[in-house]
Amino acid sequence: MQKVTLGLLVFLAGFPVLDANDLEDKNSPFYYDWHSLQVGGLICAGVLCAMGIIIVMSAKCKCKFGQKSGHHPGETPPLITPGSAQS
């Protein structure tokens, strides 16, 4: 009895596959042209990569690592001094 029930369940679970559309149905709203999508993505990635390299190498993007930030007006005293942590 269990084998018959299992066979029936497997048949019913696979039944919707028989009614499925063909994968190459180009009129289906769920058909995607994956090759064109991949080529377009690679072109976009190449253009963005080239633009990033050009921006990094250009003279207009100068980073000044030698300057100290002007945020701090002076050196602040340490909050914990030696000997102040005793109770």
UniProtKB/Swiss-Prot annotation:
GO biological process: one example: sodium ion transport
Keyword flag Transmembrane helix: yes
GO molecular function, one term: ATPase binding
Record region (Disordered): 66-87
PTM comment: Glutathionylated.
Alphabetized InterPro entries for the sequence: FXYD_motif (IPR047297), Ion-transport_regulator_FXYD (IPR000272)
GO cellular component: endoplasmic reticulum membrane; extracellular exosome; plasma membrane
Keywords of this entry: Cell membrane, Glutathionylation, Ion transport, Membrane, Potassium, Potassium transport, Signal, Sodium, Sodium transport, Sodium/potassium transport, Transmembrane, Transmembrane helix, Transport
Leader sequence residues: 1-20
Domain of life of the source: Eukaryota
PANTHER family: FXYD DOMAIN-CONTAINING ION TRANSPORT REGULATOR 3, SODIUM/POTASSIUM-TRANSPORTING ATPASE SUBUNIT GAMMA
Family: Belongs to the FXYD family.
Role summary: Associates with and regulates the activity of the sodium/potassium-transporting ATPase (NKA) which transports Na(+) out of the cell and K(+) into the cell. Reduces glutathionylation of the NKA beta-1 subunit ATP1B1, thus reversing glutathionylation-mediated inhibition of ATP1B1. Induces a hyperpolarization-activated chloride current when expressed in Xenopus oocytes.
Protein name: FXYD domain-containing ion transport regulator 3
Annotated organism of origin: Homo sapiens (Human)
